[in-house]
Curated annotation (Swiss-Prot):
Keywords: Methylation, Ribonucleoprotein, Ribosomal protein, RNA-binding, rRNA-binding, tRNA-binding. Part of the 30S ribosomal subunit. Contacts proteins S8 and S17. May interact with IF1 in the 30S initiation complex. This is Small ribosomal subunit protein uS12. The keyword Transferase does not apply.
Length: 125
């Protein structure tokens, strides 16, 4: 326990909370343009071809973001909405692209967890 004179000399330091998605600049989402759409492989115990896109955001940042779901229609120059959220087995991927918004279509024939993949409610037979 420090004395009062020690606290006068050197006050307590307030810990700064670092953002996990700094490129969004405290916004819930940001719009951006795809500069490159490609696949990459995950870290050690896992094996796959994960779909990712390099996106230039409206604030000038260039980020790598993940395209969730099965199949997508993204190309270079597609306009997308980027949200926070990292992908644990892809180093450097700290953002997700929102499905069913702007140029990216929702997942086709998705029945469960539809809101996360921008899929409309299926028509009843």
């Amino acid at each position: 326990m420090p004395t009062i004179s020690q606290l006068v000399r050197k006050p307590r330091e307030v810990s700064v909370i670092k953002s996990k998605s700094p490129a969004l600049e405290n916004c819930p989402q940001r719009r951006g343009v795809c500069t490159r759409v490609y696949t990459t492989t995950p870290k050690k115990p896992n094996s796959a071809l994960r779909k990712v896109a390099k996106v230039r955001l409206t604030n000038g940042y260039e980020v790598i973001s993940y395209i969730g779901g099965e199949g997508h229609n993204l190309q270079e120059h597609s306009v997308v909405l980027v949200r926070g959220g990292r992908v644990k087995d892809l180093p450097g991927v700290r953002y997700h692209i929102v499905r069913g918004s702007l140029d990216l279509q929702g997942v086709k024939d998705r029945k469960q967890a539809r809101s996360k993949y921008g899929a409309k409610r299926p028509k009843k037979a």
